[in-house]
C-alpha cells in the first residue's frame, strides 16, 4: 500500500510538471508581451553606437515613445498583440537632429511607417518591402524597432534548457524576408528573448541580436542594453536605454503627422 501511495504521488507530481509547461503559443505570446507590450505605454532615451568593420564608430541619440491598444498587461486579454504606435525622435548628431520615425502597427494589414527628414522638410513613407532594411544606418532593421508580427511565422519548440526555451521561427511567406528562419533563446522566467540568431537558405548564421543587460523597471523586466551584429559585414550596433518609464499617460494624438514637424517636448524630456 505504501509503495502504491508513493507511486501515485510520483505520477501526480510528474503530471503536474508536464501540465505546468507552457505551450509554444504561450511562450511566443509571452515573449512578444515582454518585449514590446509591457505597460500601457512607454518612454526611453537611447544611445546608439554603430561600429563598422574597420572599428570606426558613429553615435546617435534618440527618444522612443510608445502607445498601446488595448491598454492592458493581461495575456488573456490579448496584451501580447494589439494596435501599437511608436514615435522615435532623434536629437544627435546634428545631421539627424529633429528627424522622426513614426510607426502604426496594424493587425489586419501591413504596418504603416513614416520617416520625417527635417533638412528637406519631407515626410517619407517607408514601404512594407523596406521593413527589413537598415534603420538609420545601423545593424538594426526598421522591423526590429517596432517588432515583427508573430502571425507571420510558424513557431517550433526545438528544446528546453535549464534557462531557455529555444524556438525556431520560419516565415510563412519566405519571399517577404531575407532569412530562412531564426532561433530565439527565450528566458524561462522573464520570457525576454536573450539571443536571436538569423540563418540564411544555406543554414548559415549571419545576424545575431543579444540582450546584454536586463533591469526590473516598475515591475517589468526590461532590456536596457542590446546589440545587433551583422556577421557578414563585420559591423555591430549597441543600443543603451536610460530613463525608461512605463504608464506615463502619453496621448494617442502625438502619434500623427502633425507631430512629425512639432515634437511633443513634454514627453521627450
Predicted features and spans:
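Positively charged n-region of N-terminal signal peptides that target proteins for export
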Residues: 1-4
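Bacterial N-terminal signal peptides
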Residues: 6-15
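N-terminal mature ectodomain segment of secretory-pathway/periplasmic proteins
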Residues: 20-119
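Gly/Pro-enriched, hydrophobic low-complexity segments
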Residues: 102-106, 112-116, 122-127, 131-150, ...
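Short, contiguous, pocket-lining structural segments
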Residues: 159
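Gram-negative outer-membrane assembly/targeting C-terminal domains
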Residues: 249-269
